[in-house]
Amino acid sequence: MKPQFITLDGIDGAGKSTNLAVIKAWFERRGLPVLFTREPGGTPVGEALREILLNPETKAGLRAETLMMFAARMQHIEEVILPALSDGIHVVSDRFTDATFAYQGGGRGMPSEDIEILEHWVQGGLRPDLTLLLDVPLEVSMARIGQAREKDRFEQEQADFFMRVRGVYLDRAAACPERYAVIDSNRSLDEVRNSIEKVLDGHFGC
């Protein structure tokens, strides 16, 4: 099997941070070479843009926000993702372009056609081989976000914003079931872990 590009995505409060540890443990047990990274971020340029994008004081317009996301992504692809895959290393990214379609597209209203143009220009033919989409009901997402001590620029949005974000995620997953695995993360940690491990076992033929 060629090196796999796997993404972990979902609305805020879906449990990505918790379940990244599950994925890391799965790769460690199997002794597979893997690189974990994140978006926006993963490079010095990407991390600098992340600070701007998540800062509640940032007053960026929708197009500027979207372009910053893709600028960070281009650096990420060129400096991190493609070199790792070329070296035979699997890559797991905490968020990728699905998040742009969901947040800037669904949440903010950026036309999907415009995002697709940037996607093709920045990524070429690069697409994830597998996307683990963590999903929780809107009220669960909002409750978990509400527990955060400090909310970033996106976490400060209202429920209707996250309702649209979640809708885009689920629509994209339904349109391409061969790439997406939707994981109900409104369950116990053990149940969610078992679901993720089952998906990874099936994908890698373990």
Curated annotation (Swiss-Prot):
Keywords: ATP-binding, Kinase, Nucleotide biosynthesis, Nucleotide-binding, Transferase. Coiled coil: none annotated. Its EC number is 2.7.4.9. ATP binds at residues 10-17. GO terms for cellular component: cytosol. Gene3D superfamilies: P-loop containing nucleotide triphosphate hydrolases (3.40.50.300). SUPFAM superfamilies: P-loop containing nucleoside triphosphate hydrolases (SSF52540). One of its GO terms (molecular function) is dTMP kinase activity. One of its GO terms (biological process) is dTTP biosynthetic process. Pfam families: Thymidylate_kin (PF02223). Phosphorylation of dTMP to form dTDP in both de novo and salvage pathways of dTTP synthesis. Belongs to the thymidylate kinase family. This is Thymidylate kinase. The lineage of its organism: Bacteria, Pseudomonadati, Pseudomonadota, Betaproteobacteria, Neisseriales. The gene is tmk.
